[in-house]
Amino acid sequence: MVQSLSQLQGPVSNMSFIIGRAVAKARGKLAFSQGRGLSGLAFDKYPFLARLGLKEDNLGCWNGKEWVGNGVSHTAKNPATGESVASVKFGDVNDYETCLANMEEAEESWMMTPAPVRGDIVRQIGLKLRDHKDDLGALISLEMGKIKSEGLGEVQEFIDMADLACGMSRQLPGQVLPSEREEHAMLECWNPLGKIGIISAFNFPCAVHGWNTSVNLICGNTQIWKGASSSSLVSIAQTKLIAEVIQDNNKNGGIATLCQGPGSSVGQTLIDDERLKLISFTGSSSIGKTVASSVSGRFGRTILELGGNNAVIVMDDADIEVALSSVLFAAAGTAGQRCTTLRRLVLHEKIYDKFVNSLVSAYKVTSVTKTTLSLTTNMQMC
């Protein structure tokens, strides 16, 4: 027989809640004003922000030609401390329209660029990310709240995807088929879709964008990206790096645009825009259903990466120490904020009490600090 951990009452019945409660407790013990300048922002505490081209005051829309921001103001915060780090002036619907106009301008020339050349530009984006990996990983940790090693892992995912896409650019398929007409053959050739919209979530502000962008660009599409509002600095920093590579190759900046803004205005406009042939959305299942319905209603295409309801089943013959370490990180990794987070733990009755006691002990040594969540990996069964 097996028992579900969700049957328990107490601190281990909801693993994500434990982390959230610990974060809230830690926030209450921190002095938010420490390290702030005259602006009231903690920007100067983090030198890597300036190295990524960020400022205390940032514009949130790259239309392919210039940085603009005519929408509402947003304050980027460190979720581990609550301190304000920098400000962002969001784009509005008019800024969005400028992005689309510049994408239209860039579309034909990018489409006609040979796929291996597009792939080489994506490869260069990967190289640029390598040069700024440590700073960008630190920014992801700062703005999203995950540990720095996970932030670095996100950047590496983008780098790996850029490498993969570069190779794929030389393997885009096509066929030569026989024809019933003499001295004729039929050639199959895949064409770019055109303009693409990307909406990414706060919990993986770099990797998800990287997966989409790497493949999208080698296929010859132009794109507009709306990252999550709470990770706007990551979106701006990444876009600056990509725009620099595109400019170095004398290509039109409208290939890859960014418009940070509220989901209710910029996001909804993007979803409803018939000029965007495909929408890639990462977020909750409930919002994903709405996106799918809206886009399919205009005969558009969608790529949806939504929520999960994940379980671990541990039998009595399992390697318990490995299972314990895996369960803790599955529940607490990424501060518990991901679609693959562990929600249900099912244990064989023979190991149930021992495993639960060990898991409670493991949570007691899991520390929440100002900027990182440290997970203890050297754990023993009680």
Language-model segments: what does each one mean?
Residues 2-87, 120, 124, 172-200, ...:
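Terminal low-complexity tails and localization/encapsulation signals of metabolic enzymes
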Residues 83-172, 183, 362:
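Glycine-rich loop-to-alpha-helix module at the N-terminal edge of alpha/beta enzyme cores
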Residues 84-91, 106-112, 198, 312-315, ...:
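Short, well-ordered beta-strand elements within core beta-sheets of diverse protein domains
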Residues 139-147, 177-182, 373-380:
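Short linear capping/connector segments at secondary-structure termini
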Residues 163-178, 247, 365-371:
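Proline-centered turn/helix-capping motifs that create local helix->coil transitions or kinks
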Residues 174-322:
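Rossmann-like NAD(P) dinucleotide-binding subdomain of oxidoreductase/dehydrogenase enzymes
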Residues 241-244, 286-382:
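ALDH superfamily catalytic-core signature
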